Amino acid sequence: MTTQRHRVVCVLADGMATSIGVAIANDLFGAPRQAEGLLGVPWYQYTVCTADPSPVRVGAVDVHVRHGVSALSRADTVIIPGRGTRPPPQELLAALTRAYQRGTRIVSFCTGAYVLAEAGLLDGRPATTLSDVLTN
């Protein structure tokens, strides 16, 4: 019997994500789990995507990303790590909006909420983030 794994996609863009946010997503969803052998199937199918598949600067590290935003069309859950110093590309914002409209679960870590706001996904909704990053 084959069971479909839950598809999780982490979204990156050059200078957009914090390294700790990416590490958390990788550890939670991308790392092998000891219990997977007990359950008989892996828990998640984990993918990282970006607008232009290429090396993406995350903190002081270049992350080699092989998948484009088309990966979002197959996602069950989309992860937005904490936001870095650059705004997300419009192509990513549009892809997030399409994923949301399809009913995909979208999760942000910390200041990743700003990316959701820039995509218009928080319009009229309460949201939280770190208070020390608020400027208005």
Predicted stretch roles:
Residues M1-I106, Y114-A119:
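Extended, subdomain-level signal for the structured scaffold at the beginning of enzyme domains
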Residues D123-N136:
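A conserved active-site-flanking secondary-structure segment within enzyme catalytic domains
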Residues I106-V107, T128:
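Structural detector of well-ordered beta-strand residues that form the stable sheet scaffold
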